[in-house]
Amino acid sequence: MVHFIFVTGGVVSSLGKGLTAASLAMLLQAKGFRVSVRKLDPYLNIDPGTMNPHEHGEVYVTDDGAETDLDLGHYERFTGVSACKFDSITTGAIYSKLLKDERLGNYAGVTVQVIPHVTNIIKDFILSNTKGVDFIICEIGGTVGDIEGLPFFEAIRQIGNQLKSENCLFIHLTLLPYVKTARELKIKPTQHSVKALRAIGISPNILVCRAERHISKGAIDKISLLCNIKSEYVVPAIDQKNIYLVPIAYHNSGLDNKVLKFFNINIMPSKLDKWYDIINRLKDSNSKVRIAIIAKYHKLKDAYKSVIEALNHAGIYYKYKIDLVWTNAENLTEESINKKLLDIDGILVPGGFGERATKGKIIAIKYARTNNIPFFGICFGMQLATIEIAQNLIGIKDAVTEEFKVDGTKIIEKINKNCEDSKITIENVKKTMRLGSYPCSLVANTIAANAYKSLEINERHRHRYKFNNEFQNIFEKHGIVFSGFSKDEEIVEIIELPLLRWFVGVQFHPEFKSKPFEAHPLFIQFIKAAIEYNKCN
């Protein structure tokens, strides 16, 4: 029998529902249960694939090519279980299906309404694909009271009535703000949040209270009294210095055991050795390396969430703190770069779309190459690395990417050469995008092959352009090694400059497969090179 857990939020957004869901999933795994985590987003976009990072943050890509919310990255990193397209849905996707079915006559002429037709699609999503799991945790995006979220709350209310309490648990996450003048945590916002949730027919079984400091027993008892929840089911969620401390904090507060007790499941011991090892490594991380991220969205860290975490995973591996130096690529010039990248141990240019800030990124790549600073280029970062090499090392001064320039020598070209730019719209952009996991063959005795310790790998992709293979020979004559190719050898996946300390560009997104207990091999080697560079300088 599958048990369903719904995680909702109130008071404010960005409270950490995703981390709570991911942490609980991991804790249940540690007790031997099989867990699936899903995200339901109330926005009207079909998926976040074409959303501005300022609106949404990172687009997380799954193995099967779904473009999803960054919370799925948390789910994967904490549980080690790969997410898929069946783990994410939006209001836009729901209405798209609904309207398509209506046009096909699948509703047999009845009036199509939010209840029951929209809610039925939501329920079908939640209740489907349950084979082989013991728990399904569903995170509802947004906060209680949001207009766009009402169909989702109604759907899970109906599921709660349908499955009864023995198979359905509601966890509500709220904020206890600390008011300095009063010197106390305020409970009133939590009261109102629970009241709003009850007004739509849902009574939370567990209340998780986020706070920046210790919550006293008196405060917990007061919350219990005013929100009509047993005090043992009021769980404190105190701010942590590192997100990888969150699961153990929840374990210490008994969240996992409270869930099992609610479902009348025997409480079993937890196997948390690898997480305690992570905590110990974090405590032992006294040295640090400085990594510059040459970013287009330098003020929006969530746009590069998986990159940040992958760097931190490598730091955990070596017991090093990663000091990230966010560098605005738009403001980088040949004259300013020495000052802005002073005392840097490694330079990373992440993926992205659009022409803005490309000049600064190319300047940073040149700086890394000519000063022998460890460099890692990801997706667009690799493409710009080939353009920089073409312009400044090989001498192809008019080297360009076809993504932005029609005139010039096209070092980077479309994957689908038959697709005209005029035909590329939001409706068909996915048809021209190489999305999801693809196999890649590595060349023996290269940096990549030595890092992976294998000649066959699978990595996730999200790109429409690739290196123009016509230039492979001239690049090789100048010392560039092409160390990874797609299975059909049409797409260059990895480039290296072996004569430098560490200079690697990859067409894929390795950050999506990194875990805190299993750092990605390329990030491990990049940070290793940065540590060695730091020691030499």
Swiss-Prot record:
PROSITE patterns: GATASE_TYPE_1. It catalyses: UTP + L-glutamine + ATP + H2O = CTP + L-glutamate + ADP + phosphate + 2 H(+); L-glutamine + H2O = L-glutamate + NH4(+); UTP + NH4(+) + ATP = CTP + ADP + phosphate + 2 H(+). GO terms for molecular function: ATP binding; CTP synthase activity; glutaminase activity; identical protein binding; metal ion binding. Mg(2+) binds at D71, E139. One of its GO terms (biological process) is pyrimidine nucleobase biosynthetic process. CTP binds at S13, D146, I147, E148, K222. Pathway: Pyrimidine metabolism; CTP biosynthesis via de novo pathway; CTP from UDP: step 2/2. Homotetramer. CTPSs have evolved a hybrid strategy for distinguishing between UTP and CTP. The overlapping regions of the product feedback inhibitory and substrate sites recognize a common feature in both compounds, the triphosphate moiety. To differentiate isosteric substrate and product pyrimidine rings, an additional pocket far from the expected kinase/ligase catalytic site, specifically recognizes the cytosine and ribose portions of the product inhibitor. This is CTP synthase. It comes from Rickettsia rickettsii (strain Sheila Smith).
